[in-house]
Regions:
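Amphipathic, hydrophobic secondary-structure cores in small proteins
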Residues: 55-73
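Secretory/periplasmic and organellar redox-cofactor proteins
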Residues: 1-52, 71-99
Length: 99
């Protein structure tokens, strides 16, 4: 399998807006965060609108950061968001999820 380059295609202004959207989601819904071997996991409150906001951000990230993989699921009454990528992407994942 070919490894994708670790590069984001967003410009500076769009990157700031995206960062703000992630920070707002995490501020509104994050219950706990943990590191995974190749990424991180965030448990989110399963409240109205949270899954939709997370899905929208996942879709947007997929368009600009193809080297990251996202998995959103349910786990013990909460949402579980896993973000994984190559080892060199760890600082990006940590920054995205403010670990």
């Amino acid at each position: 399998m070919e490894e994708l380059p670790i590069a984001c295609t967003l410009g500076a202004a769009d990157m700031a807006d995206r960062r703000d959207a992630w920070e707002a989601l995490l501020r509104d819904a994050a219950l706990e965060r943990e590191r995974l071997p190749h990424g991180a996991r965030v448990r989110l409150r399963d409240a109205p609108g949270i899954a939709e906001r997370a899905r929208a951000l996942i879709a947007a990230e997929g368009a600009c950061c193809a080297f990251l993989a996202f998995d959103l699921g349910a786990d013990d009454g909460a949402l579980r968001l896993d973000v994984t990528g190559p080892d060199d992407a760890r600082p990006i994942i940590d920054g995205l999820l403010t670990l």
